Every structure is written in structure tokens, then in C-alpha cells.
């Protein structure tokens, strides 16, 4: 991981001036010589450089998760990123915050990550990066190990991506096929307005059965009042199954679709 946070800049150069632009490129090239991967933070927005230098596996280069609490990023921010920042390459957004209220840190200007817990899971799919973080404290994950299972299961590299529905600034739902497998993961997020996402799993292989595990906002979930309310549902699905998921204000959902084993085909109930 490479980064230049705050005033740690060589020669006092401007953070995003020409000298530093040249320096960021130099760092990526030099790392490639030694077969070292780079995840750059505080660098300029990438413009497809990872195509030439695939060792550049990710950049921050936009307001990440910390700005939701410290800098006042709004709930719609993450619904825009796939259409602007991520066009230039993978983004290390550092998702996975389960305890979104930061009262223990004292008097912060905003003091809360502006999402529900379920939306944090969805970001692992909607915001592409081949290197993902579990950015919260261990003790916060220990309180919700059933939800943490999605972070353990979700892939980080993909063979295929399907953008199911989207309206920049409002909502987005993405399905991705895990590289080298027939497993899929779906993530859906919304802005400050609650909504219901609806879609058919027609991207799945016809004739196959999958175990679907849905991590969704609870009925009383709200990003300000009750961000940790979530529910988990499991069932057998096919490419003809229709999914309908309610998303709370600044909420979302994550859905894993894993090929069913012979035993699971008998023991897991059909999706309803």
C-alpha cells in the first residue's frame, strides 16, 4: 500500500500537481520492475493506467468511507462512484463498517457513517476492487458474525458483471460472477430514499440450482436511527427465480448465489 496522507509530500509539492503526478507514475513503474503490487491512496484519479500496469491493483483517489463520517459525504455518494471514479480503474473504498456510529471518538463534525450495515456488505460488489478491506474493528465483526460471513464468501475478481438496474445518484444493483467458478454475488444500494429492488436471476446458468443467501435491511432499518438492523434469508434458486428486496434509507442488500451441493438440494428449502 502506497500513500501520501496529509503533509507527507516530497519537497513540499502540491498534492495533485504535475510533479506529484509524475511521481505516482514513477512509483507504479518501479514497483512493476520488482513485481510488487500497488494500492495507492491519496493519489490522483486513475485513467485506465492499470491496463498498462496491472500491478496497480487499486487506488483510493476519491472520497472513501472515512469521509462519510469525517467529511460529510452524502448517502448518494456511493451510487455515483461506479459512473465517474470507477471508470478510471478499481477503487479501494475500504467498506465493511458494521458499527457506523462513532460517538466513542468524541465530538466529530458528522460522527456517523451514512449507511446501514447491509449497504456496507453491498459495497463489496458495487464498488469493484481486486483488493478489498474489512475496515472495521474486530470486536464489531464479532457482534455480527452471521453478516460477516458475506465478507468471507464474496469474491474479489470476476469473470462477468451484469448491471441490473441503476440511476446515477439514486440507486444501483450489480451482479458479478466469481472468477473461475459458477458462483455469483449481487449488491444493491440506494441513496437517502428507501426503495424496492426487483430482478430475475436470469444471468444464472440454466438448469442449475444455487443456494441463495440474502443479507438485507431489517424492517425497521434506517441509516440514521437503526443502521445495524438486518435480516438473512436462504433458499434454493434457479435462473427463473424472481427477487424482490426492500432497501431502507441509505440501505442496500448483498446476495450470494453458490452452486448447490447434492445434499443442499435436499436440505435447503426452495426460495419463496
How would you name each of these model-derived features?
Residues 35-42, 69-70, 132-144, 160-162, ...:
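Acidic/polar loop patches that form or flank catalytic/metal-binding clefts of enzymes
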Residues 168-210, 253-256:
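Carbohydrate-binding surface patches
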Residues 136-185, 220-226:
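Glycan-recognition and catalytic regions of carbohydrate-active enzymes
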Residues 234-271:
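C-terminal beta-strand-rich structural cap/linker in extracellular carbohydrate-active enzymes
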Residues 47, 98-136:
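Charge-patterned, long linear interaction tracts outside catalytic cores
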Residues 38, 126, 186, 250:
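Conserved, mostly hydrophobic/aromatic
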Residues 1-111:
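Aromatic- and carboxylate-enriched substrate-binding clefts and catalytic-loop regions
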Residues 214-240:
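Solvent-exposed beta-strand/loop surfaces of large extracellular or lumenal domains
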Amino acid at each position: 500500500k502506497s500513500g501520501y496522507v496529509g503533509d507527507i509530500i516530497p519537497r513540499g509539492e502540491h498534492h495533485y500537481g504535475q510533479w506529484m503526478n509524475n511521481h505516482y507514475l514513477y512509483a507504479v513503474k518501479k514497483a512493476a520492475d520488482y513485481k510488487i503490487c500497488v494500492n495507492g491512496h491519496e493519489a490522483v484519479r486513475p485513467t485506465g493506467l492499470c491496463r498498462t500496469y496491472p500491478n496497480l491493483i487499486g487506488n483510493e483517489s476519491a472520497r472513501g468511507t472515512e469521509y462519510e463520517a469525517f467529511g460529510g459525504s452524502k448517502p448518494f455518494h456511493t451510487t455515483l462512484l461506479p459512473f465517474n471514479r470507477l471508470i478510471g480503474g478499481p477503487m479501494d473504498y475500504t467498506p465493511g463498517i458494521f458499527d457506523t456510529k462513532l460517538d466513542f471518538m468524541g465530538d466529530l463534525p458528522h460522527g456517523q457513517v451514512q449507511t446501514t450495515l447491509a449497504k456496507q456488505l453491498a459495497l463489496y460488489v458495487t464498488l469493484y476492487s481486486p483488493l478489498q478491506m474489512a475496515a472495521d474493528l474486530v470486536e464489531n465483526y464479532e457482534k455480527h458474525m452471521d453478516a460477516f460471513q458475506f465478507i468471507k464468501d464474496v469474491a474479489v475478481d470476476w469473470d462477468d458483471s451484469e448491471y441490473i438496474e441503476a440511476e446515477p445518484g439514486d440507486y444501483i444493483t450489480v451482479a458479478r460472477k466469481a472468477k473461475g467458478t459458477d458462483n455469483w454475488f449481487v449488491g444493491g444500494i440506494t441513496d437517502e430514499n428507501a426503495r424496492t429492488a426487483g430482478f430475475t436471476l436470469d444471468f444464472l446458468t440454466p438448469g442449475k440450482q444455487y443456494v441463495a443467501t440474502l443479507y438485507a435491511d431489517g424492517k425497521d432499518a434506517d441509516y440514521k436511527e437503526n443502521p445495524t438492523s438486518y435480516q438473512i434469508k436462504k433458499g434454493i434458486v434457479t435462473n427463473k427465480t424472481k427477487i424482490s428486496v426492500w432497501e431502507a434509507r441509505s440501505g442496500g442488500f448483498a446476495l450470494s448465489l453458490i452452486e448447490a451441493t447434492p445434499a443442499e438440494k435436499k436440505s435447503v428449502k426452495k426460495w419463496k
